[in-house]
């Protein structure tokens, strides 16, 4: 089990670098934390980006690695939006949320060519 966690950590690090390049990020967030599923029960979300602290929190518990990475991509898009001076607006259907959703999906489609084995894992 520890080996799989280590592999997933390596993939997450690789993915952050991939997304940073694709989005042409000026910097990385101050921290990216992976937490258990209790966070999603408490906050009703699988990920957050705090624009004040520049921190990302991603729920990893009981989720496929590709789903975790898609959430990470979504939050990294919010980081990019902050770099561009776009207003934070977490409302469902807002322009920045729709952009983050669409771009995260696009990034996952591109990353499948880098790590196709992600889609054969359980």
Where are these regions (language model features)?
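Auxiliary, metal-adjacent structural segments of Zn-dependent hydrolase domains
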Residues: 5-60, 112, 117
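Active-site recognition of the HExxH zinc-binding catalytic motif
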Residues: 70-83
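N-terminal low-structure segments adjacent to metalloprotease catalytic domains
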Residues: 1-7, 80
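Post-HExxH zinc-binding segment in Zn-dependent metallohydrolases
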Residues: 90-122
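Hydrophobic (often cysteine-bearing) scaffold residues that line and stabilize catalytic clefts
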Residues: 8, 12, 69, 96
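Substrate-binding clefts and substrate-entry loops adjacent to catalytic sites
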Residues: 82-91
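Short pre-active-site segment immediately N-terminal to the catalytic Zn-binding motif
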Residues: 55-72, 90-92
